[in-house]
From Swiss-Prot:
Gene giving rise to this polypeptide: guaA
Keyword RNA-binding: no
Disulfide bonds, paired cysteine numbers: none
Domain of life: Bacteria
Protein's name in the database: GMP synthase [glutamine-hydrolyzing]
Domain GMPS ATP-PPase stretches: 208-400
Function field: Catalyzes the synthesis of GMP from XMP.
Xref: Pfam families: GATase, GMP_synt_C, NAD_synthase
Pathway: Purine metabolism; GMP biosynthesis; GMP from XMP (L-Gln route): step 1/1
Organism: Cronobacter sakazakii (strain ATCC BAA-894)
Length: 525
């Protein structure tokens, strides 16, 4: 029997901050399981989860407004430690008898907090000392409202020049509020504060580790599927690859992977997937060459969302046909990860907007009565990569730049044709090869080439050519919500451009995209 890796757990109530998932990832990094729920949960749900501690996230609302989100009253009666972050601190203060006011001045960016009262949350943690010998902490603020009076049974632990209550605490009840964001890297000692709360104050053990997550997943897969057969759509991406390796470890040859080669993959990617998973790891893989079918379906379609939906529809059709050929398959495996679960829950409650349609397996034929196996559904992407390494998958594959589900279908602008895909594949491969050679690949967050359906005049030797244009795109980002274009060296860009134009017959011009996000998105379509 494996350890119960869910025995100690933290509940994070989400008030809408862009950083909330980061809070959860930090808690997981500390080796403790946590879940992220909407703020309006019931007492019964909290009791059922039985957390060792609760974190109230930040959020964009104002506690001074009527009908603004509030923590359930039971949070403060559950007998477990509570940490309020930014908005979470403000609603804690207001609900427990303090006072919050709107401010004409937003405090956004770095601040230095001076600790004036001893507290279990920050004891022994400091970045520097004040002239009076008090600990100073470099933190990241992002708030408009501020607490102007703390509840009567709380003490002020720390303050800044403009924020009199930067940290408040009720040590007896183990309630803590911080006006800054400990989860972001700009708060230099933030992870230590979260560790103090989660590991010391909430007394959680570090049971959530890659090796134990794998053991737990394998055991749960075996319990769920028994001696049945399982089918998985393997794309070669991180999520489906790690799902395949977990299932293979759990049930061996009773897993069948279906790899649909849609003709929209990167250079040599289909061969690499078959070599790695079929020849090297010995998985049972059905290779379905379907390039012509996808390109026929995409003929005449130039609108991005229509292309996405067409690619998704044809994928489901092809996958369904292959699934029906297999006998006695009772389960469908999917590489759903925890952010997908969070997004689905938000969509179901009307708290999120769909910006782009997701490319995923769905709509299996009604005659196929299959159960769903989702071994990654509790994991964030960084956790999936770590267990992939533990399972033996190569680092370069797990830490590749993101690649869209529809593949080159949304990197060829306008109508998708085989000629365009072939040119783009080779241009993209040269760009990535040169990034790796110059030790720049891991210094940018994402890099790729885009095919532009416009012709441009060029000169080759004594002749003129009238060929296609390719754009290079490279960005730097922390969360992919915002991004800066990567300032790659001019000589590097010149070398990439020369190679693409000289080595690929059909491309006469290379341009570099210098648009940030916002206003542009990272992908062109």
């Amino acid at each position: 029997m494996t350890d119960n890796i869910h025995k100690h757990r933290i509940l994070i109530l989400d008030f809408g901050s862009q950083y909330t998932q980061l809070v959860a990832r930090r808690v997981r990094e500390l080796g403790v399981y946590c879940e992220l729920w909407a703020w309006d949960v019931t007492e019964e749900q909290i009791r059922g989860f039985n957390p060792n501690g609760i974190i109230l996230s930040g959020g964009p609302e104002s506690t001074t407004e009527e009908n603004s989100p509030r923590a359930p009253e039971y949070v403060f009666n559950a007998g477990v430690p509570v940490l309020g972050v930014c908005y979470g601190m403000q609603t804690m203060a207001m609900q427990l008898g303090g006072h919050v006011e709107g401010s004409n001045e937003r405090e956004f960016g770095y601040a230095q907090v001076e600790v004036k009262t001893d507290s279990a949350l920050v004891r022994g943690i400091e970045d520097a000392l004040s002239a009076d010998g008090n600990p100073l902490l470099d933190v990241w603020m992002s708030h408009g409202d501020k607490v102007t009076a703390i509840p009567s049974d709380f003490v002020t632990v720390a303050s800044t020049e403009t924020c009199p209550f930067a940290i408040m605490a009720n040590e007896e009840k183990r309630f803590y509020g911080v006006q800054f964001h400990p989860e972001v890297t700009h708060t230099r000692q933030g992870l230590r504060m979260l560790e103090r709360f989660v590991r010391d104050i909430c007394e959680c053990e570090a049971l959530w580790t890659p090796a134990k997550i794998i053991d737990d997943a394998v055991e749960r897969i075996r319990q769920q599927v028994g001696n049945d057969r399982v089918i998985l759509g393997l794309s070669g991406g991180v999520d489906s690859s790690v799902t395949a390796m977990l299932l293979h470890r759990a049930i061996g040859d009773r897993l069948t992977c279906v790899f649909v080669d849609n003709g929209l993959l990167r250079l040599n990617e289909a061969e690499q997937v078959m070599d790695m998973f079929g020849d090297h790891f010995g998985l049972n893989i059905v290779h379905v060459p379907a390039e012509a079918r996808f390109l026929d379906a995409l003929a005449g379609i130039d609108e991005p969302e229509a292309k996405r939906k067409t690619i998704g529809r044809v994928f489901v059709e092809v996958f369904d046909e292959e699934a029906l050929k297999l006998e006695d398959v009772k389960w469908l495996a999917q590489g759903t990860i925890y952010p997908d679960v969070i997004e689905s829950a938000a969509s179901a409650t009307g708290k999120a907007h769909v910006i782009k349609s997701h490319h995923n397996v769905g709509g299996l034929p009604k005659e196929m009565k299959m159960g769903l196996v989702e071994p990654l559904k509790e994991l964030f992407k960084d956790e999936v990569r770590k267990i992939g390494l533990e399972l033996g998958l190569p680092y370069d594959m797990l830490y590749r730049h993101p690649f869209p589900g529809p593949g080159l279908g949304v990197r060829v602008l306008g109508e998708v044709k085989k000629e365009y895909c072939d040119l783009l594949r080779r241009a993209d491969a040269i760009f990535i090869e040169e990034l790796r050679r110059a030790d720049l690949y891991d210094k940018v967050s994402q890099a790729f080439a885009v095919f532009l359906p416009v012709r441009s005049v060029g000169v080759m030797g004594d002749g003129r050519k009238y060929d296609w244009v390719v754009s290079l795109r490279a960005v730097e980002t922390i969360d992919f919500m915002t991004a800066h274009w990567a300032h790659l060296p001019y000589d590097f860009l010149g070398r990439v451009s020369n190679r693409i134009i000289n080595e690929i017959n059909g491309i006469s011009r290379v341009v570099y995209d210098i648009s940030g996000k916002p206003p542009a998105t990272i992908e062109w379509e």
